[in-house]
Amino acid sequence: MNNFLSCPAIPFPNFLDPIIIQLGPIALHWYGLGYVVGILFSWWYVQKLSHKKSLWYANYPPLNAEKASDFVVWAALGIVVGGRLGQVLIWDPTYYFNHPSSIIAVWDGGMSFHGGLIGTTIAIIWFARKHNINIWAMFDTIAAGAPFGIGVVRICNFINQELWGSVTNVPWAVCFSLDPQYLPRHPSQLYEALMEGFLLFIVLAFIIFAFKAFKRPGTVAGTFIISYGIARTISEIFRVPQEDPEWFSALFHGSGFTYGMALSLPMILFGFYAIFRAFRNHFIK
């Protein structure tokens, strides 16, 4: 443990332990609880939005309370399985190939947002087709509550002392006790919680209620992934980059262009396509 008194900035509050409570071999982690809170909040929020029929195209919400409850299980599977496989296959395949038992250790952290997005997208498409639901309206529905969960999980990243930021001298810099160098760093997890999470949630709520964005299916989903991609790109500037794949490092070494930025580019492009499609089709009723 680093010397608490040697920190030239705000010392990390060490009463924040990644484990909330442990009973023998069973432990409850903040990280896992964060995902549960995010999923349950989204489930609740979707039901609240579904009750306001005037918000929706043709006054017809794609999910009622029963279907929302059915989908939450598939959403959870998409997030967890997709997020973990994304971490394994997109970010660090070499490590997990050499340590296969670590693949299932979700409680230790290591979930890819982009993998979780792919997993959730697959779940949405499958569920929408099975229940004859407009896929774009379904995307909008799930996107509306997603940022809140992202914000909660980013706070859990802070508690876990992972994905910290670069060295800085800003007044709110934090010295993380798990940092071997024990240097003042940007609390980039909290930046992400704000930008990718809670502020984005407010922006989506604003366009839903003020501009009736649900009446143009695809608008909310498009705004979500554009905004997330931009926020993630900005946060990468302040964050210590994760170890990029070797092929990517060889191409962009020293450029400042990170793998996280590269993964966000197609999201932004697809988001613009979704919004263009929504307005081109002149939905609204």
From Swiss-Prot:
<feature type="transmembrane region" description="Helical">
    <location>
        <begin position="26"/>
        <end position="46"/>
    </location>
</feature>
<keyword id="KW-0997">Cell inner membrane</keyword>
<feature type="transmembrane region" description="Helical">
    <location>
        <begin position="218"/>
        <end position="238"/>
    </location>
</feature>
<dbReference type="GO" id="GO:0042158">
    <property type="term" value="P:lipoprotein biosynthetic process"/>
</dbReference>
<keyword id="KW-0812">Transmembrane</keyword>
<feature type="transmembrane region" description="Helical">
    <location>
        <begin position="133"/>
        <end position="153"/>
    </location>
</feature>
<keyword id="KW-1003">Cell membrane</keyword>
<comment type="function">
    <text>Catalyzes the transfer of the diacylglyceryl group from phosphatidylglycerol to the sulfhydryl group of the N-terminal cysteine of a prolipoprotein, the first step in the formation of mature lipoproteins.</text>
</comment>
<feature type="transmembrane region" description="Helical">
    <location>
        <begin position="107"/>
        <end position="127"/>
    </location>
</feature>
<comment type="pathway">
    <text>Protein modification; lipoprotein biosynthesis (diacylglyceryl transfer).</text>
</comment>
<dbReference type="InterPro" id="IPR001640">
    <property type="entry name" value="Lgt"/>
</dbReference>
<keyword id="KW-1133">Transmembrane helix</keyword>
<keyword id="KW-0808">Transferase</keyword>
<feature type="binding site">
    <location>
        <position position="154"/>
    </location>
    <ligand>
        <name>a 1,2-diacyl-sn-glycero-3-phospho-(1'-sn-glycerol)</name>
    </ligand>
</feature>
<keyword id="KW-0472">Membrane</keyword>
<protein>
    <recommendedName>
        <fullName>Phosphatidylglycerol--prolipoprotein diacylglyceryl transferase</fullName>
        <ecNumber>2.5.1.145</ecNumber>
    </recommendedName>
</protein>
<comment type="similarity">
    <text>Belongs to the Lgt family.</text>
</comment>
<feature type="transmembrane region" description="Helical">
    <location>
        <begin position="71"/>
        <end position="91"/>
    </location>
</feature>
<dbReference type="GO" id="GO:0008961">
    <property type="term" value="F:phosphatidylglycerol-prolipoprotein diacylglyceryl transferase activity"/>
</dbReference>
<dbReference type="Pfam" id="PF01790">
    <property type="entry name" value="LGT"/>
</dbReference>
<feature type="transmembrane region" description="Helical">
    <location>
        <begin position="256"/>
        <end position="276"/>
    </location>
</feature>
<feature type="transmembrane region" description="Helical">
    <location>
        <begin position="194"/>
        <end position="214"/>
    </location>
</feature>
<dbReference type="GO" id="GO:0005886">
    <property type="term" value="C:plasma membrane"/>
</dbReference>
